[in-house]
Regions:
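PIN-domain endoribonuclease scaffold, especially VapC-family toxins
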Residues: 23-90, 101-106, 119-122, 137-138
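Acidic, PIN/NYN-like endoribonuclease modules and their adjacent C-terminal/linker elements
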Residues: 1, 73, 100-158
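Short, well-structured N-terminal submotif of metal-dependent ribonuclease cores
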Residues: 1-37, 49, 53-58, 142-158
Length: 158
């Protein structure tokens, strides 16, 4: 399970430079959840794309329906105290803090391309590239080898 923010959802359902990567995120983990406000944020992002003449209004409506039908599996309520605390501590908007708060409450990653969230909440926020990268191998701590003289002590030299 991951928390999917609005930009991940838009990249998944629209033709963008990040669409292929968003599809790979979905293939790796298809259980996406978001706070209730994802709908308004996706609609706002699609409207922004329409106003920039990147898509017509019919395509924006279709993209929203695709996001609603195919991407977000679960929607969760947030604790307002936690949201406001995250917003205050990380310097985020309450909108962005909803996603971070949800990821922390569920103990999962928030996959986002929002640079401020990635910078201020590295405990839960991952870019698509980070999420798709293989995990770092565990660090192996090796004991310092004993000096040759110590290792040879007690052995006979016949």
């Amino acid at each position: 399970m991951i928390v999917a923010d609005a930009n991940l959802l838009i990249n998944f359902v629209c033709a963008t430079p990040f669409s292929e990567m968003a599809r790979r995120v979905k293939a790796r983990d298809s259980d996406w959840v978001s706070p209730h406000l994802w709908k308004a944020e996706v609609l706002n992002g699609l409207l922004t794309m329409h106003r920039a003449q990147l898509m017509d209004l019919d395509r924006a409506v279709l993209a929203y329906r695709n996001a609603a039908a195919a991407t977000v599996v679960g929607v969760h309520d947030d604790d307002p105290d936690a949201v406001l605390t995250v917003a205050r501590d990380a310097g985020l908007s309450a909108y962005d803090a909803h996603y971070v708060s949800m990821a922390r409450a569920l103990g999962v990653f928030l996959v986002t391309e929002d640079k401020k969230i990635l910078r201020t909440c590295p405990d839960v926020a991952r870019s698509m590239r980070q999420f798709l990268s293989p995990p770092e191998p565990p660090i192996t701590v090796r004991e310092k080898p004993a000096a040759y003289k110590t290792r040879r002590k007690g052995k006979s030299t016949a």
